[in-house]
């Protein structure tokens, strides 16, 4: 575990971040180095114990992440599992991702952070994180530290051997969790193939595999979910990646759930957000929340394309 002076240092950084104040470039660099050491030891299918609170996309909506912690409890009092998409689109990607990585370094056993499709060099150059780093630091170094770190994030997690958690969805190239365990994940998100599918695919009402309108990943039907759950002794697939107006929805006869944790997404969608609490007995409860009160959003024009709205 971390020596006391380092711990005090980190605690100070976390409380600074909780006030939505970014760290210095040097602090971010050191933090990412420590985080990399921790993440290197985690599996592509990272085991997680209950009780745990499972969260979906945050997308740089820092004040709503603070609201999530207010409702769900602060780390380390509550164990958390975040399913990716910390950056892009919102105005505070830097503060959001730095806080989550800071919590990971401080409480590695209490928080699990997975990779989303936005935790990629290519996507962040289009949807805002790269530009935000330039604006806040005057150069791209912080963007580079984080995007290098993103390559080490686990792709999926398994809660108590029965709830399979990941950002996007299933892949026609993956039949078992062991298939996923055998990937080399330390790379930029590929344009196709199984690793890409885990971060990009979506459940669908139609059976079988379908072409995804997103241009990456696949759509998959209830028959596919059932087969995967059966082959891997799973009760539930929990994922994020899609805006849902109630903050959550069930698909595939409650064998699959979507969790979205960015309320009033892009500051204009009017949706609720939710988190999923899994207790010691593995009962699960969705908790909905609304946006945190806004105190003067920066006036940033939206020039980024909306690839799914």
Curated annotation (Swiss-Prot):
<dbReference type="GO" id="GO:0004722">
    <property type="term" value="F:protein serine/threonine phosphatase activity"/>
</dbReference>
<keyword id="KW-0904">Protein phosphatase</keyword>
<dbReference type="Pfam" id="PF00149">
    <property type="entry name" value="Metallophos"/>
</dbReference>
<keyword id="KW-0378">Hydrolase</keyword>
<feature type="binding site">
    <location>
        <position position="59"/>
    </location>
    <ligand>
        <name>Mn(2+) 1</name>
    </ligand>
</feature>
<feature type="binding site">
    <location>
        <position position="117"/>
    </location>
    <ligand>
        <name>Mn(2+) 2</name>
    </ligand>
</feature>
<dbReference type="InterPro" id="IPR029052">
    <property type="entry name" value="Metallo-depent_PP-like"/>
</dbReference>
<dbReference type="InterPro" id="IPR047129">
    <property type="entry name" value="PPA2-like"/>
</dbReference>
<comment type="similarity">
    <text>Belongs to the PPP phosphatase family. PP-2A subfamily.</text>
</comment>
<dbReference type="InterPro" id="IPR004843">
    <property type="entry name" value="Calcineurin-like_PHP_ApaH"/>
</dbReference>
<feature type="binding site">
    <location>
        <position position="57"/>
    </location>
    <ligand>
        <name>Mn(2+) 1</name>
    </ligand>
</feature>
<feature type="binding site">
    <location>
        <position position="167"/>
    </location>
    <ligand>
        <name>Mn(2+) 2</name>
    </ligand>
</feature>
<protein>
    <recommendedName>
        <fullName>Serine/threonine-protein phosphatase PP2A catalytic subunit</fullName>
        <ecNumber>3.1.3.16</ecNumber>
    </recommendedName>
</protein>
<feature type="binding site">
    <location>
        <position position="241"/>
    </location>
    <ligand>
        <name>Mn(2+) 2</name>
    </ligand>
</feature>
<dbReference type="InterPro" id="IPR006186">
    <property type="entry name" value="Ser/Thr-sp_prot-phosphatase"/>
</dbReference>
<dbReference type="GO" id="GO:0046872">
    <property type="term" value="F:metal ion binding"/>
</dbReference>
<feature type="binding site">
    <location>
        <position position="85"/>
    </location>
    <ligand>
        <name>Mn(2+) 2</name>
    </ligand>
</feature>
<keyword id="KW-0479">Metal-binding</keyword>
<feature type="binding site">
    <location>
        <position position="85"/>
    </location>
    <ligand>
        <name>Mn(2+) 1</name>
    </ligand>
</feature>
<keyword id="KW-0464">Manganese</keyword>
<feature type="active site" description="Proton donor">
    <location>
        <position position="118"/>
    </location>
</feature>
């Amino acid at each position: 575990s971390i020596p006391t002076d380092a711990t005090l240092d980190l605690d100070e950084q976390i409380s600074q971040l909780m006030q939505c104040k970014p760290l210095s470039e040097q602090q971010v660099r050191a933090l990412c180095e420590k985080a990399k050491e921790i993440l290197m030891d985690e599996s592509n299918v990272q085991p997680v114990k209950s009780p745990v609170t499972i969260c979906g996309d945050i997308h740089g909506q820092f004040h709503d992440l603070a609201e999530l912690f207010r409702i769900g409890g602060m780390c380390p009092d509550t164990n958390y599992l975040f399913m990716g998409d910390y950056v892009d689109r919102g105005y505070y990607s830097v503060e959001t991702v730095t806080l989550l990585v800071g919590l990971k370094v401080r409480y590695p056993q209490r928080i699990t952070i997975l990779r989303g499709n936005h935790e990629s060099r290519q996507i962040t150059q289009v949807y805002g994180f790269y530009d935000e780093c330039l604006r806040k630091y005057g150069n791209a170094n912080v963007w580079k530290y984080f995007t290098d770190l993103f390559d080490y994030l686990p792709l999926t997690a398994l809660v108590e051997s029965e709830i399979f958690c990941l950002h996007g969805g299933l892949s026609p190239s993956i039949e078992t969790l062991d298939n996923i365990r055998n990937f080399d994940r330390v790379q930029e998100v590929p344009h196709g193939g199984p690793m890409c599918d885990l971060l990009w695919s979506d459940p669908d009402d139609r059976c079988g595999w379908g072409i995804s309108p997103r241009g990456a990943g696949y759509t998959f039907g209830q028959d596919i979910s059932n087969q995967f759950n059966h082959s891997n002794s799973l009760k539930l697939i929990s994922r994020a990646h899609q805006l849902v107006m109630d903050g959550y929805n069930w698909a595939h006869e409650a064998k699959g759930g979507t969790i979205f944790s960015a309320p009033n997404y892009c500051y204009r969608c009017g949706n609720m957000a939710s988190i999923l609490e899994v207790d010691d007995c593995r009962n699960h409860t969705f908790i909905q929340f609304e946006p945190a009160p806004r105190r003067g959003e920066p006036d940033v024009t939206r020039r980024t394309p909306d690839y799914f709205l």
